[in-house]
Amino acid sequence: MKKSIYLPFLVVALMVAAVDAAFAQARIARTEFLCYDKREDAKRDIRTQIDKYIAIAPTLQFQSDEGGVRAVYEQVITVPASWNDYNAYLHTENIGNDYTIFVNGRQISRPIDKHTPSELFISPYLDQGDNTVAIVVVAEPYMSTIAEDIATSPRTQFSNCYIFAQRKLGIYDVNIRLLPDSLNRFAQLHLDVEVDNSFSTDETIEVGYDIYAPDGKLIDYSVNDLAMTGFSRDTMRFKPWVYHSNPNRWSPANPKLYDLMLYTKRNGILWEYMPFKVGFAEYGYNDKGQITAFGQPLQLKESRYNAAADRATTEKEVKALKAKGINCLSPTHPQPQWFYDICDKVGIYVIDCAAISSPTGADDRTIAGTSANAPWLLEDYLMRVETMYRRAQNHACIIAFRLANAPSGNGYNLYKAYELLKSFGDTRAIIYDGAEGEWNTDIE
């Protein structure tokens, strides 16, 4: 039975003010992707043919200019019995304000910042039949202090919000790199596929891929079995050589992309498809504080830029910036996925940035003098930084990651954020322009 959270509103207000830490477990950080039922739909991003996909456009139930809860938006979704063997995820972006999520009257997340597209695992909170999903706009002072100077996106409210379900035995995350071999003769695909078995029983799945060169030629394909115990995750690693690849090295002057399709099979039956564009690119940094591509320093002409209201306008503006000699864009916060797709295709570098901007008290290094040194905000900092990284990691245009806009102070939270990104083993630079000689930046 659906349960509206609008009716017991006082309960909602109290829960938002004192959310249990366990609720935060619904939110996850991983590569942004959808599972398509057909290969052609995957290639063309045709979502209307995805059987278990629901667009989210909730209606306003409550609004106020005062208090901790400023608005409540609700939508009733119907979960059929056929979803029992699937994991359901809620993707949110373009909410317009900081918010939290309720499902059937139960709060499942801490407050989420309005700037970072997010994903939540909602299966444990759904019932068979009608369910009420609520997006509750909140006014939490600490949220605004973490992101003081970041403008709200100009896109339509709730655009690209959706629920989709993927099989309980399926791909959970993917890390893709196309890197040169040790002698720079050709490329090697580094494809790490994290597989999840949410069943209690032992299961076997087939995971496959095929990769096509920029000219459309099939380069390689493979299908492997993976036996998994119940309630477990494992990673399949593929490392095939990709020959005749040096002419396809990705750069603004040569933005060539390979097409990679991941898919899963069970008992010979194709289950799900996931498409990716992959660029042959290797980035790092040297001891002179320069970002490098294939070991050579890049000469960057950088511009601050956030995506426009829609994809077509953004592509037009990015092309115009490139025509003026700009070769690197620096957004102030994570962008819609199509922004990175555009930059991959058009050929322009991007230094991505977490949704952190706290100039107030930036010079105060006492505890809580700056948000960056308020330990009770650590979880919010780490989630913003990790989500930024996971969403952008597979794009050829991404040459480095910024912990925060500067100045945003420095301290415990940004130290831990730097350590977190370093733990992922990425060769790309981690930058914080407000480090002021401290150790939590690779480039000063």
Put a short name on every predicted segment.
Residues 328-444:
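Substrate-binding/catalytic cleft of secreted carbohydrate-active enzymes
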Residues 1-11, 21-337, 341-347, 384, ...:
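Secreted/periplasmic carbohydrate-active enzymes, especially glycoside hydrolases
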